[in-house]
Structures are given as structure tokens and as C-alpha cells.
Amino acid sequence: MSGDYEDDLCRRALILVSDLCARVRDADTNDRCQEFNELRIRGYPRGPDADISVSLLSVIVTFCGIVLLGVSLFVSWKLCWVPWRDKGGSAVGGGPLRKDLAPGVGLAGLVGGGGHHLGASLGGHPLLGGPHHHGHTAHHPPFAELLEPGGLGGSEPPEPSYLDMDSYPEAAVASVVAAGVKPSQTSPELPSEGGTGSGLLLLPPSGGGLPSAQSHQQVTSLAPTTRYPALPRPLTQQTLTTQADPSTEERPPALPLPLPGGEEKAKLIGQIKPELYQGTGPGGRRGGGSGEAGAPCGRISFALRYLYGSDHLVVRILQALDLPAKDSNGFSDPYVKIYLLPDRKKKFQTKVHRKTLNPIFNETFQFSVPLAELAQRKLHFSVYDFDRFSRHDLIGQVVLDNLLELAEQPPDRPLWRDILEGGSEKADLGELNFSLCYLPTAGRLTVTIIKASNLKAMDLTGFSDPYVKASLISEGRRLKKRKTSIKKNTLNPTYNEALVFDVAPESVENVGLSIAVVDYDCIGHNEVIGVCRVGPEAADPHGREHWAEMLANPRKPVEHWHQLVEEKTLSSFTKGGKGLSEKENSE
């Protein structure tokens, strides 16, 4: 289009020039000149893009101005209005507080400050003499009729709990200060024993008024400055009944406050448990076998019933009380294993209960045992403390005989037995069933992993994720290794998987197998549950017998059960030789 426009312009210019040259004085000259000027102006029009650019620029400038104005207003409000408001609010709220401190120095401002009364929400706590109210809902587990006070052994008192120092009423705090204990929100003082400060006196004052400023000055001078390094743990029944010698440690004298009516009453809410301050073993765990053998370690409740139609002994584990603390935090992670003596073929295990000394299990198990054999059988309970990174600690055990007589008791009356401290019990890691088959002509050794039973629980859920790894060993060195699949959340996995190794006939007398059951962890390192070893130079006689039977019966699978042991128990694969380390077994 630009070419046509220029041609038209040139053509009209030529016509105009010719007209001007031909008729200089013609009247149409002015009209021609006007037409040429209009055509020239039309050739250079003002584009619409310029108008759009100006409009867009004006919109952007306006928006930026509005944003800057908003930011400046917000900054001014934060710098000027908020500090002024806070200053004014504190001045208004601080006036009455100082006014209250003048005549009586209120404890709300002395202890915690802030303009609110301490313990207003717990004014009716039973420890403070007010109306009783429940702090939590009672737990009603399944088979609750077996836990009623009518059962054998009676009901057990509930475990007391601690209250936060900030939740005590002013009268309680006054009694604490009067008893020589300095209140604190972070680490409250532990009370002393007996009449020399054995507990905190949570009693209301005989007079209804607040203490004076002079009394507060005297109380401040009586407050001790020493503190214990940690908060006390929750109390148990055993702790509440423990009495210490008051002459062993000096305590500031207690100032008991009388109740209205002339009677004095003290509530014990904290007490030192001496066994918690004994020396700890490796890893911060306290030794559980230093005490006298057979000493009681709490109590366990259960119920028995025999089903004559199906020849089953039903065992229901209900709860345990007053277990000893095996962890450095003052608690344990208990679980119970049960099995029938003397064969121990079938074992059961409860779930692990975290951080408790009074676990409630309510789990039922069944043993298949004929009625004729029940009189010769004994039921064995083993209470363990779960430990994720080391060997589980044996808390205690109970051996029960006369099963038929006990099973005939009414089912609504549970049985209570004392848990006796056990000695050094052999680690029960489980058993592994596999077969060996050797083909001399093909030089092939086939290891068929069939199943495992009663494996050690390695996870907090009370289960493991086991797989089996077999390693071909020669002179303490690993030549080859094979693995099975992983079985999730089980202690009795079934595999039925074959692991094949190439072994020349001339070398079969110089090699052996190290078979490890490993717990798989998606995060972290896999952990070895237990190992067993077979071969001509195996330390276990059962492993040597299995290998010899395989060589004596070529082309036939020879199946055996093997007891799993800890890696450190079998320090070497051969007699006097060098074995695989735990790291090599877990790889």
C-alpha cells in the first residue's frame, strides 16, 4: 500500500507542477495547492499506537502510586500506632497491679505476674479441698468385668499425676512458699521426706486474706537455691509407700498450715525414688539383673479357660502393675511372651506398650493341648522391656502350674501373680526351617528357605520385616550370597524360596553356609535378628550334623529346624576361624 501511496503523491505533484508552470495566474492554483497539502498530511497520519502507549503508561504510574501510598500507610501504622497502643495498654493494665501490690503484694504478680490469678481454673481440685471434678475420662478396656474390684487381688489405686505449677491456686502457692520450696515454672523443687518437708502442703490458709509484703520478704529469704537436674517422673504405688531415712539429708523445716476445724492434713504429690538415681549401664539403660533372684517386679493379671470340645487352653492377658523402670526416662516399654513348658513349640507375644509401668493388654491367645497332657504342662509368662537398638531386657517371669484347676475358676475373676525377677535367660530370637540338597554331577547346592517362627520383634509395632540371606563361606571369607523376598509385619514368615550356589565336588568339604535372618528398614540400616551356620567346621553341632546328612544323601533335600543365635554368640564360623561380622550379614 505504501508504493501506491507514493505513486499517487508523485503523480499529483507532477500535475500540480505542470499546472503551475502552464497557468501561473489560474484561479484553480489555490485549490490544487490545498488538495496537495491534504494529501501530504494524509500520508503522515498520527498512529494509534502512541495513544495506547500513553494510556498504558498512565495506568502503571497510577497503580504504583497507590501501592506506595498503601505501603507508607502500613509502615506508619506499625511504627506509630501499635507502639503507642501497647504503651497505653500496659500503662492502663499496670496501674491496678501496682495498686494491689502496695497493701499485700499479691501472689499473682509475685510468682507469675501478668495480671491474672494463678490456679483459677483448678480452684475445685480435690487436693485443694474444693469440690471434686475429674481431670480425665476413665478408661474402660474390653473385658472390663475382669478388671472390677471384685476380682482376686482387689482393685489397684490409680496412678497419681503431676499438676503444672502455674495451675495451683494462690493459697496453694502460699503454702508451698511457706514450706520452704521456691515456686518455679520450669523445674519445681522435689519435696523432702516425712515431717521435714516430705511433700508439698496444698492447704488453704486459715485466714481468707493474702499474705502481707513483710511475710513475702521472709519467705523469699527461706527459699532454697539448689535444684535437682530433672523433673520428677510420675509416681507409682510402690513410690508412695516408700519411706526414706530423714537423717540422710538436711531439709529446710516445713511450716504446716492447719485446716479449718483444727485438723492438719498433708497431701504428698512428689517423692524421690532412690532406684532411679542408681548407676546406668551402657546406652543409658539401667541394669535389670543386679537384684536378688526371685525378687518381685510388679504383678500381672490374666484369666484361663479350657475348651473341652476343641482341646484348647485360652489365655487372656489383662494387665500388669508396678513394673520396674528399665529406661533412663523412668518408664519401660513392656510386652509379654507366653508359651507352654516343657516343649516351647508355640509362643505368643503381646503388643508393645510405650512409656508405661502399668500396661493394659487385654489380648487373648489359644494353645492346642489335649486334656490328658494339661496336668503335666506349665504356662510360662515372660515380661520384657522393648529396646529398639539393643537386646530386650527381661523384667521378670511367672511360671504357672495346675492349669486345669485354675481354668475351672469363674471367668469373671482374674488371677493375679507376682512377677519374679528372672536370671540370665538365653536370648530367644526364633527358629528357621530350611533344607539342603547337593547335586554332585552338576556341582549345585540348593538351599530352600521354608519358614521361620517366633522371630524377635524389631519394630515398635511388635513385628518385623524379615528376609533371609544365605552366604557361601570358605575359610572365613564370603564367596557368594543370595537373598529371599521381604515379608512385611510378621514374626512367622513363610518363604518356600530356593537359593542356588555353584559348588564343585572337590570343594564341598571346604565350604559352609552362614544363614542370617535380617529385619528390613526402609530408613536406616537393616538389623540382623539372628544367624545359624551349617558346614563341616560349624561351631554348632546341629549345623555339622545337617551338613553331613546332606552329603550322605545326595540329590535329596534334607530339612532341619535351626535355633537362631546372636551374631556375637557365634564369634566365628569355623572352630577357631574367622566369621562374618554383623555388618557383613546385614548387607
Swiss-Prot record:
Q: Where in the cell is it found?
A: Cell membrane; Cytoplasmic vesicle, Secretory vesicle membrane
Residue ranges for the region (Cysteine motif) are: 10-34
The cross-references to InterPro entries, in alphabetical order and at most eight, read: C2_dom, C2_domain_sf, Synaptotagmin
Where do the annotations place Ca(2+) 2 binding?
D327, D385, D387, D393
The UniProt regions of compositional bias labelled Low complexity, in chain numbering, are: 183-205, 229-244
Q: How is the cofactor bound?
A: Binds 3 Ca(2+) ions per subunit. The ions are bound to the C2 domains.
Give me the residues that bind Ca(2+) 1, please.
D327, D333, D385, F386, D387
Which residues does the UniProt record annotate as the domain C2?
Answer: 296-417, 428-562
Q: Where does Ca(2+) 4 bind?
A: D459, D465, D519, D521
Which GO MF terms are attached to this record?
A: calcium-dependent phospholipid binding; identical protein binding; metal ion binding; protein heterodimerization activity; protein homodimerization activity
> What positions are modified (Omega-N-methylarginine)?
R286
Q: Name one GO biological process term.
A: regulation of postsynaptic membrane neurotransmitter receptor levels
CDD domains the UniProt entry points to: C2A_Synaptotagmin-1-5-6-9-10, C2B_Synaptotagmin-3-5-6-9-10
Q: Topology with regard to the membrane? A: Single-pass membrane protein
- Kindly report every residue range on the membrane side named Vesicular: 1-54
For this UniProt record, the keywords arranged alphabetically read as follows:
Calcium, Cell membrane, Cytoplasmic vesicle, Differentiation, Disulfide bond, Exocytosis, Membrane, Metal-binding, Methylation, Repeat, Transmembrane, Transmembrane helix
Could you say which residues bind Ca(2+) 3 here?
Answer: D387, S390, D393
Any single GO CC term annotated in Swiss-Prot or TrEMBL for this entry: postsynapse
- This protein's source sits in the domain of life called Eukaryota
What does the UniProt function comment say about this protein? Ca(2+) sensor involved in Ca(2+)-dependent exocytosis of secretory vesicles through Ca(2+) and phospholipid binding to the C2 domain. Ca(2+) induces binding of the C2-domains to phospholipid membranes and to assembled SNARE-complexes; both actions contribute to triggering exocytosis. Plays a role in dendrite formation by melanocytes.
Domain remarks: The cysteine motif mediates homo- or heterodimer formation via formation of disulfide bonds. The first C2 domain mediates Ca(2+)-dependent phospholipid binding.
Q: How does it assemble?
A: Homodimer; disulfide-linked via the cysteine motif. Can also form heterodimers with SYT6, SYT9 and SYT10.
The entry's protein name is Synaptotagmin-3
Protein species of origin: Mus musculus (Mouse)
Per the UniProt record, the lineage of the source organism begins with:
Eukaryota, Metazoa, Chordata, Craniata, Vertebrata
